[in-house]
Amino acid sequence: MKARGPFCIRHAAADTFAMVVFCFVTGMIIEIFVSGMTFQQSLASRTLSIPVNIAIAWPYGVFRDYVLRQGRKISPTGWMKNLSDLVAYVLFQSPVYAAILFTVGASTDQIITAVATNALVSCGMGVLYGYFLDMCRRWFKVPGYTVSEG
């Protein structure tokens, strides 16, 4: 992946689309089937998450790209890219997710369970999100965006 140049609307749109879609689906699954939230609580959480994800999508993309660059300095391998995706996802998303759950009235136990589960599931989810984000950036034809091999 190339380093990012000046602001690009396609880049921001791709990052926003990826964040909103991915987080809506995965968040609802975790909240209902793992954390024991009701459908109504989860729907409220996911509805609140849409504007939040719109606001954080591009900054997350910038943060992720930075973490990937740092990881490539250590090793250019595919496993390092996956590890970097995981680290970026957990570090950035966990505090945001906890705040959303708190705002919609989830109990402390539900918040801890959901955030901890999300962090554990992120071992695969952060990597999957990275692949999904890369795919969205290609779909949106982000200028100068390439995926490095390895």
Swiss-Prot record:
Single Gene Ontology MF annotation: L-amino acid efflux transmembrane transporter activity
Signal peptide: none
GO cellular component, one term: plasma membrane
TM ranges: 17-37, 48-68, 86-106, 111-131
Keyword Secreted: no
Key words, A-Z: Amino-acid transport, Cell inner membrane, Cell membrane, Membrane, Transmembrane, Transmembrane helix, Transport
Membrane topology of this protein: Multi-pass membrane protein
Family stated for the protein in its record: Belongs to the AlaE exporter family.
Protein name listed in UniProt: L-alanine exporter AlaE
